[in-house]
Amino acid sequence: MRVDGQEIDISSKVQYKGVMLSSIPNFFVASGYTNASWTLKCDLTSKYVCRLIKYCDSKGYQICMPRDVGDSEKQVMSVGLTSGYILRSINKFPKEGLRSPWKLRQNYFLDLIGLRFAALKNNKMFFS
């Protein structure tokens, strides 16, 4: 993947709420739960993305980007899967943090609060 002509090493990035990656502007990912219906998380993700885009439009922002301000305490992503193809490539996945909003959760109710009801603007999300 490239941003402004520069190649991006996804494995050096940290997931933000399981929806965006640190320091990559206007880029969203949709991945589901490995322990429940895949679409539960994708539904929350799509509604969060729509809410974020509407917020940006209402404020005149063209860029939204999570920034790792040094508090993510990066670790290898814990997807909860033990398939060989996952384990062989896990070092190429984005990292996750030890706590929110960098922690990848496998819990619908925690994600419901964090994606549907939490404030969009915080000290981790950059807008311009």
Where are these regions (language model features)?
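Glycine-rich beta-alpha-beta "Rossmann" dinucleotide-binding loop(s) and their flanking helix/strand
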Residues: 1-10
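Short glycine/proline-enriched loop/turn "hinge" motifs that connect secondary-structure elements
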Residues: 17-23
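C-terminal, flexible cofactor-proximal segment of oxidoreductases
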Residues: 15, 26-128
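Generic signal for short, ordered secondary-structure residues
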Residues: 6, 24-25
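Alpha-helical scaffolding within the catalytic cores
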Residues: 10-16
